[in-house]
Amino acid sequence: MVGALAYAWSDTFWFSAVEGEVYAYSSFCTALVFWLILKWESVADLPHANRYIILIAYIIGVSIAVHLLNLLCIPAIVLVYYYRKYKNTDLKGSLIALLVSFVLIVLLLYGLVPGFVEVASWVELLFVNVFHLPFNSGVVFYFFLIVGVIAWAIYETYAQRSDKLIKISFLISIVLVGIPFIGDGYIIGIVLTAALAYYLFTRKKLAVVAMNTILLSLFVIFIGYSSYALIVIRSTANTPMDQNSPEDIFSLGGYLNREQYGDRPLFYGQTFPAEIARDANGTAISTKGKAIWKKKLKTSEDEADRYIAVSYTHLRAHETL
């Protein structure tokens, strides 16, 4: 009742409700997620109380496709969880809980959200350019692979046939959804994957219930996140407004990463009056980012499908500071 009345006299909420934007739906998801964690808090000691945690994960997965604002609920959710599950709470524990919540936000915002598309694009490139299969064959394979692997991992946590199988299936699931692949490239992903593997295989006692909850949460986040398929379906219809035309996994990645808006250095880098840095011959010194892949136009019907690198991200000249 207090929360409803707070919204009733909130100018921000009503202003968002009357404009044709995503903020009203996003506010609804935010309120729903926090209400669900309070419901969990009231039944946390009962069997199957984790179903509220899994439902929260699903709502977060859906809300990611609406607006990333919902991720800001994670610190509050973690604090409620900490104060409910631990009896001897103190300032140090609260700060650690906040730190854990920030790590979760980073893993979702910079790991899962772009990492899923990143791994899917690698598989698509492998299937089309190396195996010479049709367009989107890699994406379809990756979709069924990730569903099958997560389902297998969930089954292993229920059956508990072997600790080794639980560890392997859990590790493969985390890697396939792209969580370790933070940022461009794969170096950070390899390091984080190795660290997770070391942690799993050096622990003698597994937190099977926690691993099961994590896997179920990842699965429902994946289901909610799949609403992004609407973007590809809509773009394939070639509607009048089709920004970036995200008709394949590569253009979808650029669309989700908002690459069309560009970027600017916030803490360190060039300023707006900075001059272009040049070498001794007067040629501008430039930096190439990762390749931007596009479908190659066929010259004949017998030609196999193929992606080609048409340009590079962050292709710009270095500027003096």
Model-derived regions, located:
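Aromatic- and kink-enriched transmembrane "portal" helix at the membrane-lumen/periplasm boundary
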Residues: 1-27, 60-70, 110-137, 177-182
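Membrane-interfacial entry segments at the cytosolic side of transmembrane helices
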Residues: 87-99, 133-139, 159-169, 185-187, ...
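Membrane-interface transmembrane helices that cradle and orient dolichyl/undecaprenyl
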Residues: 33-52, 79-90, 151-165
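Transmembrane-embedded, aromatic-rich helix segments that form part
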Residues: 29, 69-81, 113-117, 186-193
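Membrane-interfacial interhelical loops
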Residues: 109-141, 167-185, 233-255
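Conserved small/polar residues in nucleotide/adenosyl-binding loops
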Residues: 313-320
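Alpha-helical transmembrane segments of multi-pass membrane proteins
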Residues: 20, 24-35, 53-56, 72-75, ...
